C-alpha cells in the first residue's frame, strides 16, 4: 500500500471579527495545501504553540513548510524597528525559530516561502532589510505588485547547478509580495536566485546534511496556472 509523507505547514493566526464569531483561527493558506496534495503529500497545520512543543511537532512530520505572513521582528537580529516596519508577531517568530532548530536537529527537509525565507535566515543568524524601498540603495524592481497574485511580474536569475535550477531552469518570472528581504545571509546558506536589482530571491543549504530550499516569491499562488511552480512542491516532497 502506498504511503504518503506528512508535511507540517507552520500555521498563522487570524481574528474573525464578525458579529457571530470572535475567534482566533489557526490556518494555512489553501495554496500550500493544494500544492502538497498535488505532490502526493498529506498537509497538516502546525498551530502557533509553546516553543517547548517544537521537538514533538517536528518528530511527527516528514518535512517542514514555512509560509508567508507578518514581518519578522528586527529585535531578533539586533535592530530597532524602522518607521516602515509592518505588523510583527513575536509569538509566531519564537515558535517558528524553534521549529527550524528542531528541523535541523532531526534533519527534516525545509521548504520556505516569503516570510518563511526571512525567518529561516534570521533563525540561523542572518539579517533583513526591514523595508527595501527605503533601505536598499539599488532597488529598481517593484517587489510589492498590484497585479493579481496568479500573474508573475518580474524575472529572477537562478544559479546553474542549484537544486532550484533543476526545477525552474536559470531564469523564470515570479510574483512578488514583500517589502522585507535578506540583507546578510546566514553562514549556513548559499544564495541561488536574484532579482535584476540584486535582491536575494532564493537560497539553499550549504550542507548536504540539511535539505533546504527557500524562495522569496509565492509559488502557492501560481500553481493553478503554472506547472513549473508546482514543481517546487513536487521537489520538496522528493526531498523528504
Residues covered by each model-derived region:
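N-terminal beta1-alpha1 cap of cysteine-dependent amidohydrolase-like domains
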Residues: 1-111, 122, 129, 133-165, ...
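Hydrophobic, aromatic-enriched interface-forming segments
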Residues: 117-120
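Active-site-proximal beta-strand elements of phosphoester/diester hydrolases
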Residues: 213-216
Amino acid at each position: 500500500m502506498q504511503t504518503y509523507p506528512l508535511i507540517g505547514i507552520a500555521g498563522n493566526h487570524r481574528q474573525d471579527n464578525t458579529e457571530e464569531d470572535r475567534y482566533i483561527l489557526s490556518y494555512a493558506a489553501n495554496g500550500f495545501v493544494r500544492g502538497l496534495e498535488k505532490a502526493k503529500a498529506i498537509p497538516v497545520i502546525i498551530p502557533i504553540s509553546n516553543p517547548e512543543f517544537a521537538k514533538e511537532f517536528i518528530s511527527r512530520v516528514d518535512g517542514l513548510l514555512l509560509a508567508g505572513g507578518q514581518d519578522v521582528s528586527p529585535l531578533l537580529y539586533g535592530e530597532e524597528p524602522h518607521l516602515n516596519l509592518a505588523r510583527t508577531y513575536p509569538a509566531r517568530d519564537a515558535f517558528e525559530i524553534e521549529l527550524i532548530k528542531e528541523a535541523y536537529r532531526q534533519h527534516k527537509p525545509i521548504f520556505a516561502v516569503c516570510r518563511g525565507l526571512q525567518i529561516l535566515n534570521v533563525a540561523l543568524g542572518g539579517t533583513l532589510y526591514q523595508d527595501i524601498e527605503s533601505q536598499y540603495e539599488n532597488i529598481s524592481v517593484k517587489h510589492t505588485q498590484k497585479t493579481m497574485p496568479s500573474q508573475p511580474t518580474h524575472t529572477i536569475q537562478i544559479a546553474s547547478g542549484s537544486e532550484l535550477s533543476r526545477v525552474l531552469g536559470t531564469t523564470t518570472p515570479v510574483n512578488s509580495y514583500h517589502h522585507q528581504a535578506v540583507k546578510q545571509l546566514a553562514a549556513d546558506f548559499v544564495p541561488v536566485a536574484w532579482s535584476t536589482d540584486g535582491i536575494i530571491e532564493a537560497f539553499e543549504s550549504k550542507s548536504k546534511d540539511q535539505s533546504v530550499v527557500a524562495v522569496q516569491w509565492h509559488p502557492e499562488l501560481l500553481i493553478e496556472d503554472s506547472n513549473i511552480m508546482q514543481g517546487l512542491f513536487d521537489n520538496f516532497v522528493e526531498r523528504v
